[in-house]
Design a protein with these regions (language model features):
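Hydrophobic core segments of beta-strands in well-ordered, beta-rich domains
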Residues: 74-75, 124-127
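Mid-length scaffold segments of soluble, non-membrane domains
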Residues: 73-86, 90-92, 96-98
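Compact alpha-helical subdomains of small soluble proteins
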Residues: 118-123, 130
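N-terminal secretory signal peptides and thylakoid transit peptides that target proteins
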Residues: 1-18
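Short acidic-hydrophobic surface loop/beta-edge motif
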Residues: 64-68, 115-119
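C-terminal segment of N-terminal export signals and the immediately downstream linker at the start
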Residues: 22-47, 54-56, 115, 154-155
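A charge-rich, low-complexity, intrinsically flexible signal that marks solvent-exposed coils, linkers
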Residues: 60, 87, 93, 105-114
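C-terminal partner/receptor-binding element of secreted or periplasmic proteins
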Residues: 136-155
């Protein structure tokens, strides 16, 4: 089992030159928003529907945006916005767009749109590419742990 100490050791072991280190997750001390947003934008303005077409992250536009669960979601096209609006649970990232790996450990961490996985038709985001590597070591197990932890994480 990965402990906080091992997580910190792994993060510090990554070479500093050009490497992306694992952001230290944190336990929620007070109620956190259900959806992670940076600057009021879900997925940092990235189109959530675009992850499902095989192209990976695509920047959304404020021209094609909507409000869902108190957060603004941007889309690359009106068609993607309409698809999301028709079935947001299909396209919205699991764990509210917070880092899925951190959720599996019982913590919250912000995410990067470039650290993502679509698994069994669901979108999972991670804090960075190193967290994604750790997440991919046991996706089904990490999902199970994250789902078990999730009700208590937001506070």
């Amino acid at each position: 089992m990965l402990t906080r100490r091992r997580l910190l050791t792994a993060a510090l072991a990554v070479p500093a030159a050009g490497a992306v280190t694992l952001a230290m997750p944190r336990r929620a001390m007070a109620a956190e928003p259900e959806i992670f947003s940076a600057g009021g934008l879900a997925i940092r303005g990235t189109d959530p529907v675009a992850y499902f077409d095989g192209n990976g992250p695509v920047a959304g536009s404020s021209e094609h945006s909507l409000m869902w669960k108190g957060t603004t979601w941007n889309f690359a096209s009106a068609a993607n916005r309409d698809a999301f609006e028709a079935d947001p649970e299909q396209y919205a990232p699991i764990f509210g767009g917070y880092c899925a790996y951190a959720a599996s450990l019982g913590y919250l961490a912000p995410t990067s749109p470039d650290a993502w996985t679509v698994y069994e038709g669901k979108l999972y985001l991670n804090a960075n590419l190193r967290a994604r590597e750790l997440w991919l070591e046991d996706v089904p197990g990490n999902i199970a742990k994250g789902l078990a932890n999730w009700p208590g994480i937001l506070g």
